[in-house]
């Protein structure tokens, strides 16, 4: 976020009438805006039925919604609200029978795009969560009960809809794994393939037979290798939650853009809270921006209507930026209108 604050757009005026076109072509689909809802796990902890609300909002506004493997709603239940436009994010399972069944379920439920996550070779320490007292599952202590008591609306909705669960992964938990939420969380973690390799990725691509996106790429060498196998690179540092030493994706975006063919699509996330920041990413070479936290902040504050409220704010911000720099098409946001505080990075963008 601090890095994004040091990127500036220089307005250029007297260009005549500007009616910005925000539409983006991605994998043969035309989306109304250049942003979508990133995959987020255990969304039911934020608000019950969050996946349903976001799926319905995404269809209404013609933007992509990516369902996480470890979401609280299942592949099938969420698909009912996606009208065949959903994306499915896969945490690659070590057990290939589970992997193949997940892909089969997603394909049978008409998910169009597969997003394979690559950036979990080991469990991260996540010191910020530990210091904040956050745990999965939540601890049954006075602090938890206190926070539930002062948020009666959330507590009532949670009691009404049931405690959050792993909607997609629950069915793979045999007798050895049934039991407490802590045990189930352990199962979900144990099933993730720690060290993804190119052969595994090729197998996934062959099985899916549709657009495959590789999420978590942070190095141009990896991007070049991946571009020979899959259909899109997804720059991400896991929302800053996986490796504290990792740079922001916006820092490595220009280098990755230069390393790939001009028409090879790049998606980016991590730290994008506003339409202004999304415009900066597009000007630096991204084709599309995914964001998670803003939508869930909206839902946490306002429930179902919060998702639409956040969408409208971001869309209005992007349109306003394009009008201010007199740009008629989102694909034409010109790089030369950028200026950057060089104390951060990237002196030459051309």
Feature locations, PLM:
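Glycine/Thr-rich beta-alpha phosphate-binding loop at enzyme active sites
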Residues: 20, 41, 125-132, 147-198, ...
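Hydrophobic faces of well-ordered beta-strands that scaffold small-molecule active sites
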Residues: 35-38, 65-67, 86-90, 114, ...
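Active-site-adjacent beta->alpha loops and helix N-cap segments on the catalytic face
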Residues: 46-51, 67-85, 93-105, 121-132, ...
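Alpha/beta catalytic cores of nucleotide-metabolism and tRNA/nucleoside-modifying enzymes
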Residues: 1-7, 191, 248-269, 273-350
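Glycine-rich beta-to-alpha transition loops that act as phosphate-gripper elements at the mouths
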Residues: 69-72, 93, 214-220, 264-278
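An N-cap/entry alpha-helix motif that binds or orients negatively charged groups
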Residues: 1-29, 137-196, 331-333, 339-350
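Conserved, mostly hydrophobic/aromatic
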Residues: 37, 58, 116, 204, ...
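N-terminal capping/small domains of soluble enzymes
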Residues: 1-121, 314-316, 333-350
